[in-house]
Structure formats: structure tokens, C-alpha cells
């Protein structure tokens, strides 16, 4: 969140503890150091650290000490927004929660980014990480291929959902403060952000009793959609047909216009019911083309591909 705010021109100060620095400093991801060399100041060289902390100033404060907390309060007194991602007990334990920060600066905006929010629920005190969140709010259940076990997303996207939520909330809070002179406490729960991303599955479960299913790269009503082999070893192309007109265009491009009249594939319901057979037809065709050549051919016909 802070990196995006810095991109927009905000002065952002990142605070780290002397014994608990930012975990992305260690360059644990393969290849995260320039030229794969740690260098003498390796703690400042990790690409992940520099990406997430771009545009920020750095400050070390030991908030477990009285002196550290006093310095933090001085910083709060001249700040517009404070962001923290501790579990709920931490800021309360330091007397740095919203009621106490308001005493220092009445119009302060506090952003608390936790796993499950600051409510009274049984999960409230639980720490969180994006991968575990995917399992808790149900995303893993609908990710993966039919007949296989649940899977996580390729990247840990829940962190970014809470980031974007925070950015919009901060903008709204600043606007509100400019009109009313009042600050706000923005309580973001990663769980809520992730559950929002599954809203159609949740509504389907509530309304129809369906639990959702794993369908890999397929889509329930954009058919065909998938990642198909192209010519060459381990070369692939994705395409997504969103209407009967796009399906007709694809059939013509494949040189098989009769497929559009085939009762197995003539409309989206038929194509859904015969998805396996359809995938075989598409796969046999795509694997005869270079992936880039085929992408341009499909795009020229108005069919999303990449």
C-alpha cells in the first residue's frame, strides 16, 4: 500500500524493528538479487524488497521500548495516515491503537490490515498469510483441475486485494477528512477481501446449495476457454470464446465452419455439455501453429487470445 501511495506523491516512512527487519530483505526468492549476487549490503539489494518499498524513507524504531514509542508518537503528530499490519493485540498492548492515536492527533487516519479484523470473532487474533487465507475463505476449493485436489493460486493474490482495498479506503478517508475535519479507523480484514472475490460462488451456495467446482482453465459460459498446446516443446496459447459469434469466427478460422452447426457445439449449453470433445478439436488445431502466429490470427478475428 505504501509503495503505491509513494507512486502517487505521498511521503512514506517505513518503520522496522531493530531485531525484526522486513522479511523481504533476505532475498529468499531465487534470483532476487541483481546478477544473483548478494553483494556487501545484501540487506538493501533484494529485488522484492526494493519493489515493495520503492519511494519510501526508512526508519528503525524499537516500539517495545518507551523511548521508541515516544518517538513514534512524535511522528504520528505530524502525519496524515498511519498503516500497520500487526495482529490486534499488538497495537493495543503498546497503547498505540486508534483511541490512543486520536489523543495525539484527532484527525489521524489509521489503517489496520489484519487477517480477520478487529472484531470479537474467534479468529480475530490469528496471524495471516496470503496462502493460508486462500484456504480459509475458500479460494483453494475452486482452484485446480477437475478430479484433483484443491490448489492455491499461482501467486499469492490476497495480499494485493487488501492493498488495493486500503488504497481506495485511504483516498476516501482523506476526502472525508477534508470535508469534515474528522479522521477514521480503517479496519481491513484479508479474509473479507478474499471472500468478496468469491462472491458469485458464495451466492450460488446460499441460493442453490452448490459448493462450486474445480474446472482448471475452463469457464462456465465462455466456451471454449483454455490453455492449449502450440507447436514446439512446452509452447502454449490461451483463448477464450465469449459468444456464439466468436465461436462461428473460430470455426471459420479453423477451416471447419460445419462445427458451428454441429448439435454438440451449436450453442454455449451444448458446448458446455461436450467440453471434453470440444477441447480435443481445439487442441488438435492449435498444436499445428506457432503460438505468436496463432495469437495474431485469433485476435484479427476478434477472439481474445494470448
Model-based region annotation:
Residues 19, 115-117, 190-195, 232, ...:
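Glycine-rich beta-alpha junction loops
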Residues 131-134, 161-168, 219, 241-245, ...:
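Conserved active-site and cofactor/substrate-binding residues in soluble primary-metabolism enzymes
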Residues 118-119, 147-156, 178-194, 210-220, ...:
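Conserved Rossmann-fold dehydrogenase catalytic segment
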Residues 30-36, 206-213:
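Short Pro/Gly-enriched beta-strand edge/turn motifs at strand-loop
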Residues 1-179:
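N-terminal helix-loop segment corresponding to the beta1-alpha1 unit
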Residues 144, 163-183, 196-208, 251-258:
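Oxidoreductase and adenylate-handling cofactor-binding alpha/beta cores
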Residues 39-41, 49, 213-220, 226-227, ...:
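Short Gly/Pro-enriched turn/cap motifs at secondary-structure boundaries
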Residues 224-305:
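Aromatic-enriched alpha-helical interface/lid elements that frame and gate functional surfaces
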Amino acid at each position: 500500500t505504501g509503495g503505491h501511495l509513494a507512486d502517487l506523491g505521498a511521503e512514506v516512512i517505513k518503520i522496522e524493528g531493530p531485531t525484526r527487519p522486513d522479511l523481504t530483505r533476505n532475498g529468499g526468492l531465487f534470483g532476487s538479487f541483481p546478477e544473483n549476487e548478494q553483494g556487501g549490503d545484501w540487506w538493501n539489494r533484494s529485488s522484492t524488497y526494493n519493489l515493495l518499498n520503492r519511494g519510501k524513507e526508512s526508519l528503525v524504531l524499537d516500539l517495545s521500548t518507551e523511548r521508541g514509542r515516544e518517538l513514534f508518537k512524535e511522528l504520528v503528530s505530524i502525519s496524515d495516515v498511519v498503516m500497520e499490519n500487526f495482529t490486534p493485540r499488538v497495537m493495543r498492548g503498546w497503547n498505540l491503537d486508534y483511541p490512543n492515536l486520536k489523543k495525539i492527533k484527532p484527525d489521524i487516519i489509521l489503517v489496520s490490515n489484519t487477517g480477520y479484523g478487529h472484531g470479537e470473532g474467534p479468529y480475530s487474533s490469528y496471524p495471516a498469510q496470503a496462502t493460508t487465507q486462500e484456504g480459509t475463505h475458500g479460494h483453494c476449493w475452486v482452484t485446480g483441475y477437475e478430479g484433483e485436489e484443491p490448489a492455491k493460486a499461482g501467486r499469492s493474490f490476497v495480499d494485493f486485494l487488501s492493498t488495493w482495498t486500503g488504497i481506495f479506503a485511504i483516498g476516501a478517508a482523506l476526502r472525508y477528512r477534508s470535508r469534515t475535519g474528522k479522521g477514521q479507523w480503517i479496519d481491513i480484514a484479508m479474509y473479507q477481501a478474499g471472500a468478496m472475490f468469491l462472491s458469485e460462488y458464495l451466492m450460488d451456495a446460499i441460493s442453490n446449495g452448490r459448493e462450486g467446482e474445480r474446472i482448471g482453465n475452463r469457464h462456465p459460459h465462455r466456451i471454449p476457454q483454455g490453455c492449449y498446446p502450440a507447436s514446439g516443446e512446452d509452447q502454449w496459447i490461451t483463448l477464450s470464446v465469449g459468444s456464439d459469434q466468436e465461436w462461428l469466427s473460430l470455426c471459420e478460422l479453423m477451416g471447419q465452419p460445419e462445427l458451428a452447426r454441429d448439435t454438440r457445439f451449436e450453442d454455449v449449453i451444448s458446448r458446455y455439455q461436450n467440453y471434453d470433445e470440444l477441447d480435443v478439436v481445439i487442441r488438435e488445431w492449435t498444436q499445428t501453429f506457432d503460438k505468436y502466429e496463432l495469437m495474431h490470427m485469433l485476435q484479427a478475428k476478434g477472439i481474445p487470445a494470448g
